[in-house]
Amino acid sequence: MSASTVSITANTAAATRRTPILAGEKKSNFDYPQSESLANGGVGEAGGTSRDLSRGEATLDRSQGQDLGPVTRRSVSAATGTNTTATQRRTRKVATPKSEKARWKTVVRIFAKQLGALLIIVGLIQLTRKMILKASSPSSPISSYETEMAFSGLESRIAEVDGLVKATTNSMQVQVELLDKKMEREAKVLRQEIERKASAFQSELKKIESRTESLEKSVDEVNAKPWVTKDELERIYEELKKGNVDDSAFSEISIDELRAYARDIMEKEIEKHAADGLGRVDYALASGGAFVMEHSDPYLVGKGSSWFATTMRRAHTNAVKMLSPSFGEPGQCFPLKGSEGYVQIRLRGPIIPEAFTLEHVAKSVAYDRSSAPKDCRVSGSLQGPESSAETENMQLLTEFTYDLDRSNAQTFNILESSSSGLIDTVRLDFTSNHGSDSHTCIYRFRVHGRAPDPVPVVGTNLDQDSSPESE
């Protein structure tokens, strides 16, 4: 719908609104006859005609009027000066029914108003639509300006938000850096404190370890070299009891006699330790009947490096040095190749094992002690008369580490968990030494224990059963 249509419609509505005004013009209910009009000089007719011509109205049909009877009008003539009496017939116009005319006019008026309002609303909607289309069109200068203004406002807000975010980020970064520096300082102080306490703790621990090692050495030396055993004390006590001396006689013993007795005991102990160094029975002594069954590869250098020296027992002839006293002389040992190896020994007889002693050259006379074994393991079994080298039935007896800071002859007791019975074969395994890659030397290996108690033979009834048959 165009603008011209809207304007034309509006004019039509205005004309429609003016229609009731023209139709509702009030006219006189009295109609004068023609003679009266002529008597009045034709003024009324002329006036009526003039009115009808100016307003474009049609003359009303007077035949519809109602005759109300004659009406007498008096008029004075100015020319003659006489009174003229004219009889005029008065008629009343029959009125149309107002209710019907008002109803259809009201309906038309309401319809026209509604139609006009509808047309106006439609026109406004069309105009608004065109304005929106023009605003959304990119070619419109007004819409582009508004868009630029909107974008500029949006960019300014985005810039403000960006600046706020950057400021917040910078402040947070500063706070984080300060916190990191503070934590780093505290961590550094804490680390220094921990290191200081750790160093102090390590120093104290080293002191405790040194004291423990010295105490262990003292205990081992005391255990390894007992001057007077319990059996000897009991024997001395028995000898004193056999002397048949009473308290008075004992009180009369002189100091010289006590010194002589003590000297006698000391000489016996010295002789005993000079003979073997420990004062304990060695069941792996070669001169007592023990021998080496087999061993790992020997380390032989020089003329005697041939394997022809190996006997039928798969042991070298010089392996007997491991079961013989070396008397502390350097070089009186049997070297085995590498840092790992083993030696299997047949004892002089079945025993109940108690301890084992591994001996190396003394520190005071040694040239190099790096060939001494370090981590060792001892196992044993009872094989009987058959001399076999099987290790399947071997039972672990003890594990130990040979320490170069202790005495050259170190004794190790069997494990408490190993409830071993009789054994006649012992195997020594070493898995490392104290630094030598070429060989490991064993000066002497001893086995301590006690022989089993002899079982008394109890008489049976075999002789009694066989006596009647002999008869």
Swiss-Prot record:
Residues 19-98 are annotated as: Disordered. The chain crosses the membrane at residues 106-128. Disruption phenotype: No visible phenotype. When associated with SUN2 disruption, abnormal nuclear shape, rounded instead of elongated, in some cells (e.g. mature root hairs) but also numerous meiotic defects namely a delay in the progression of meiosis, absence of full synapsis and a reduction in the mean cell chiasma frequency. InterPro entries: SUN1-5, SUN_dom. GO terms for cellular component: cytoskeleton; endoplasmic reticulum; endoplasmic reticulum membrane; nuclear envelope; nuclear inner membrane; phragmoplast. The keyword Cell inner membrane does not apply. One of its GO terms (biological process) is protein heterooligomerization. GO terms for molecular function: protein-membrane adaptor activity. The modification N-acetylserine is found at S2. Keywords: Acetylation, Coiled coil, Cytoplasm, Cytoskeleton, Endoplasmic reticulum, Membrane, Nucleus, Phosphoprotein, Signal-anchor, Transmembrane, Transmembrane helix. A motif (Nuclear localization signal) lies at residues 88-95. Signal peptide: none annotated. Residues 78-88 have a biased composition (Low complexity). It is found in: Nucleus inner membrane; Cytoplasm, Cytoskeleton, Phragmoplast; Endoplasmic reticulum membrane; Nucleus envelope. Residues 129-471 are perinuclear space. Its main location: nucleus. The modification Phosphoserine is found at S63. It is a single-pass type II membrane protein. Forms homomers (e.g. dimers, trimers and tetramers) and heteromers with SUN2. Interacts with SUN3, SUN4 and TIK. Core component of the LINC complex which is composed of inner nuclear membrane SUN domain-containing proteins coupled to outer nuclear membrane WIP and WIT proteins. The LINC complex also involves nucleoskeletal proteins CRWN/LINC and possibly KAKU4 and the cytoskeletal myosin KAKU1. Interacts with LINC1, WIP1, WIP2 and WIP3 at the nuclear envelope (NE). Interacts with SINE1, SINE2, SINE3 and SINE4. Interacts with NEAP1, NEA2 and NEAP3. The SUN domain may play a role in nuclear anchoring and/or migration. The SUN domain is required for interactions with WIP proteins. This is SUN domain-containing protein 1. It comes from Arabidopsis thaliana. The lineage of its organism: Eukaryota, Viridiplantae, Streptophyta, Embryophyta, Tracheophyta.
